């Protein structure tokens, strides 16, 4: 989760706080753009900074774009931030739209005569798919993981971990729910966007920025 709620540094480049009113954003845009315009600023980074100022203003001046940026900044950082203009929702294992997806974390064990290896995987699926995948993984673990005592013990741990994972709700799921809420809205599927935003809201424990952003997003979906 982004620590400062500004994954791409748009608020930073305009020198405004994340809760800045539109009037301040406009004021800072004109001031910063004038200062960094490459026609009269000899700084070697002037072109890059001026372009970023323009991109930042284009996002933050629009209520809906700004809200989407703020939500995605909760779950992405600068290095993995997605293209907001080409955001696609995650779908179930059959490649279909699904309003009840979760991230399933599983532990896979493979034994050898000299020991064993284990790795954790993450899959996006619905509840029914998750149960089937856990059973399938458990069978595979038993077939691959019975050759040594240490692997057998690790398999018991993996079995418990995998079955508990079906019901897990954590940061990975919050990321999935936010992503799909924004992606479905961008794809004009407000029904799915609303459901995912509501589910994400249930995972927010405190009355902080996350809850405020999600409630605003849901209100906009309800209004339109």
Task: Enumerate the language-model features and the residues they cover.
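Alpha-helical protein-protein interaction scaffolds
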Residues: 171-224
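N-terminal J-domain/J-like co-chaperone modules of DnaJ/Hsp40 proteins
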Residues: 1-44, 52-60, 64-68, 75-78
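Membrane-proximal topogenic or attachment-prone low-complexity segments at protein termini
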Residues: 48, 55, 59, 71, ...
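Short, tandemly repeated low-complexity microdomains enriched for cysteine and small residues
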Residues: 69-72, 212-214
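TPR-adjacent "capping" and linker segments in tetratricopeptide-repeat scaffold/adaptor proteins
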Residues: 2, 163-178
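Extended, hydrophobic interaction surfaces within ordered domains
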Residues: 38, 45-71, 133-156
